[in-house]
Amino acid sequence: GPMWGAVYDRTLIFAQNNHAVVSLAGLVQPRIEPEICFKLKSVPPRTRNPLEILEHSEWIAHSVEIVQCHHPEWKMTLADCVADNALHGRLIVGTPVAVEKIAGLAAALPFLKISLFKNQVRIDHGVGANVLDSPLLSLAFLVEILAAQKESPPLQAGEIVSTGTLTDAHPVQ
């Protein structure tokens, strides 16, 4: 099921011209996940309407999360994942694009296609609908869950939210 954890300044990397060299030092069993990120310009409301969620986003960017697992052979429960900060290791964010510059973005996101390559060989592919039917609905889910959990602070303007992997997580070296 869906889970979330914190991304820290020290684990957030902005790719320059969509390129980044990232150290895997200190990460345990790292894997790569292609994702979509949003930067919030204001606090999104509790809604399942993708257009309303998008109105509160400043920009969108493709991203790569490097996840890690402290459990042998990635064998764990959901509770283990949550205790391991949702497996977060690094978040590499590509070039941000202002959401208003992409016509029909909310409707197009479920159909967004991504291919994951390793040494010029495609090892996986996915679509935006793989994350709760749309990256925007994934963001809406997070808003809803945080609102229902009074001990969790709500999302804030300026925060960057990654919406979940579009493919399986694959080992990276």
Listing of model-derived features with the role each one plays in the protein:
Residues 1-134, 143, 148:
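Catalytic-core "active-site belt" of small-molecule-metabolizing enzymes
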Residues 139-146, 159-163:
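Short, structured beta-strand/loop micro-motifs enriched in basic residues and often containing a Trp
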Residues 150-153:
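Phosphate-handling active-site elements
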Residues 155-173:
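Conserved metal-binding segment of the jelly-roll/cupin
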